[in-house]
């Protein structure tokens, strides 16, 4: 029996056999530690009833561990050079489908409908390329896909921002966007030494469990996120200054903004990072009614 793909020796053999060279532009860093891969699968609670979407399978190291436990794995791979490698390394597993496509351009909902009809739940599990982590996660959340959750490895700093609490250094618009849709928790720190090539920073695994509905009720989701973006536009400025300077028509509506801040008992001298998601929702709803 061949060793697992993720063992350093097997990874080296595969890369040598295909003369594969890493593309920095695609953020390719392959994991060479089977124990860590298995812990990721554990955190995703993958069972024989789970359908799994993987993004960026590389040479199939995580895919293999997922395939051993899941009912079905569908992996999106953007790099054409990896397709013959994946066909080879994953040949023992009949429950794996590789799609050669950029997941950001893919109709993921249709893929789910076609591929996972006989699965009880769907998880996204992946070692995401650093350079597109946030766009991928926001696409998965904003498209309201029928997912149970998302368990992904990403840059440690980004994971900390996603799971951050108000008033912390890491808390910002990304924290609120992710926590609006999910319950977020960093479940593992992964040292940079277990990758080839070795990245410059450590990684973390974050678990995002989809909420039944948004964390807070908002009158208009689009305006809510517009308000969040404006509130964090310049972190050192007060909330009032940020809203006046960064909301469309903010300057013309300064008195309205001040009035709504007063009505919602939010001090305009505070900074955006001190507001909870509930306070942002109250402010968003008040402003939306007053402005539109």
UniProtKB/Swiss-Prot annotation:
One GO CC annotation: cytosol
Keyword field: Cytoplasm, Methyltransferase, RNA-binding, rRNA processing, S-adenosyl-L-methionine, Transferase
Q: What happens when the gene is disrupted?
A: No visible phenotype. Not essential.
Q: What is its EC number?
A: 2.1.1.182
Q: Where in the cell is it found?
A: Cytoplasm
Q: Which Gene3D superfamilies match?
A: Ribosomal RNA adenine dimethylase-like, domain 2 (1.10.8.100), Vaccinia Virus protein VP39 (3.40.50.150)
Sequence positions that bind S-adenosyl-L-methionine: 29, 31, 56, 77, 102, 127
Instruction: Please give the Pfam families that the UniProt record associates with this protein.
Output: RrnaAD
Q: Which PROSITE patterns match?
A: RRNA_A_DIMETH (PS01131), SAM_RNA_A_N6_MT (PS51689)
List the molecular function annotations (GO) for this entry: 16S rRNA (adenine(1518)-N(6)/adenine(1519)-N(6))-dimethyltransferase activity; RNA binding; rRNA (adenine-N6,N6-)-dimethyltransferase activity
Q: Which InterPro entries match?
A: KsgA/Erm (IPR001737), rRNA_Ade_diMease-like_C (IPR023165), rRNA_Ade_Mease_Trfase_CS (IPR020596), rRNA_Ade_methylase_Trfase_N (IPR020598), rRNA_adenine_dimethylase (IPR011530), SAM-dependent_MTases_sf (IPR029063)
Task: Kindly state a single biological-process term from the GO annotations of this entry.
Answer: rRNA methylation
What CDD domains does its record include? AdoMet_MTases
Top-level taxon: Bacteria
Q: Which SMART domains does UniProt cross-reference here?
A: rADc
Recorded catalytic reaction(s): these are: adenosine(1518)/adenosine(1519) in 16S rRNA + 4 S-adenosyl-L-methionine = N(6)-dimethyladenosine(1518)/N(6)-dimethyladenosine(1519) in 16S rRNA + 4 S-adenosyl-L-homocysteine + 4 H(+)
The record's similarity note reads: Belongs to the class I-like SAM-binding methyltransferase superfamily. rRNA adenine N(6)-methyltransferase family. RsmA subfamily.
What is the documented function of this protein?
Specifically dimethylates two adjacent adenosines (A1518 and A1519) in the loop of a conserved hairpin near the 3'-end of 16S rRNA in the 30S particle. May play a critical role in biogenesis of 30S subunits.
PANTHER family the UniProt entry points to: DIMETHYLADENOSINE TRANSFERASE, DIMETHYLADENOSINE TRANSFERASE-RELATED
User: What is the protein name for this chain?
Assistant: Ribosomal RNA small subunit methyltransferase A
